[in-house]
Amino acid sequence: MLEFEQGFNHLATLKVIGVGGGGNNAVNRMIDHGMNNVEFIAINTDGQALNLSKAESKIQIGEKLTRGLGAGANPEIGKKAAEESREQIEDAIQGADMVFVTAGMGGGTGTGAAPVVAKIAKEMGALTVGVVTRPFGFEGRKRQTQAAAGVESMKAAVDTLIVIPNDRLLDIVDKSTPMMEAFKEADNVLRQGVQGISDLIAVSGEVNLDFADVKTIMSNQGSALMGIGVSSGENRAVEAAKKAISSPLLETSIVGAQGVLMNITGGESLSLFEAQEAADIVQDAADEDVNMIFGTVINPELQDEIVVTVIATGFEDKPSSQGRKATSTGFGSSVNSSSNHQSGASAKEDSFSAHTSHSQSSESVNERSHTTKDDDIPSFIRNREERRSRRTRR
């Protein structure tokens, strides 16, 4: 179902809270990039690390418990530190309509304190979104186990959760990419999501979206996908939509999403046909009965560029794809093409795949051969054609 939302746009208050070393670093990089209409808060048990934060609000938690020396990679200490400093956290969150809590899972402060911070934010009535990373495989089993427990705690505390496995950074960078540049790629998922929502609710459009629309799609929805796609030139709408729904860093693909908030921003040349093209790409990739709320904004400064922002939620719980190399919605052009990628999106591709045994009939083999030629066609386009074919046969 495609809904058009029109009316007055109320400006909501957005706050981004970085918890622990990883969360603090993410906040610093977002501040360096430059963002408007967002308040940044840094929370840590390590007083020395907190001094390096560029956030306007800094909270040292668990001063009595840790004496400012950190959580020692113990999530239980991180949790108790946040509980000790609950009042300070509440004061910092006060007045927020939406709170992003970002942290690295696997250590002490981020893993233990971030779920407590998120729970406080949600209890105070803020729409609460978690953006967390899983540790690299080489960091060891103990850290992976702690991270898994932290992710589950975050799921229980937030409205929606976005998980970025650090191992996937290895798929989108080459061997010569500096480490800090690689981490910026992960931070971009958070930055683009926050920037996209900020723009959605702060800029009035021809077909308008407001904070109520964001809440409709993101409240109590579990896993989420947030993405922004930018393109220009021929097929710009289609290309921007593809980029928005295909981040190789995320554990969740858009396949099966039951709720989608989509905004298209373009110059005065943005046409109705282009808006329809972009919406079709997103709608066909999501669930057949998706609740899709759609908005457009005309920004003359963009000239030939189109920006597509997508927030997708309402996924059925699926086994974690932590061990898989990258998500796939049929695109992922930034991913190393030599890798063998598979994700939740590929579940819909299985009926088209060429994995057949030698005992199959010649008809099956012919079908496999035909499918192989179409391997470069995005799965959701093939799904769309299949649905249309079924409707025609009826």
UniProtKB/Swiss-Prot annotation:
GO terms for cellular component: cell division site; cytoplasm. Residues 328-346, 353-364 have a biased composition (Low complexity). Keywords: Cell cycle, Cell division, Cytoplasm, GTP-binding, Nucleotide-binding, Septation. It is found in: Cytoplasm. It comes from the Bacteria. GTP binds at G21, G22, G23, N24, N25, G108, T109, G110, E139, R143, D187. GO terms for biological process: division septum assembly; FtsZ-dependent cytokinesis; protein polymerization. Pfam families: FtsZ_C, Tubulin. Belongs to the FtsZ family. This is Cell division protein FtsZ. It comes from Staphylococcus epidermidis (strain ATCC 12228 / FDA PCI 1200).
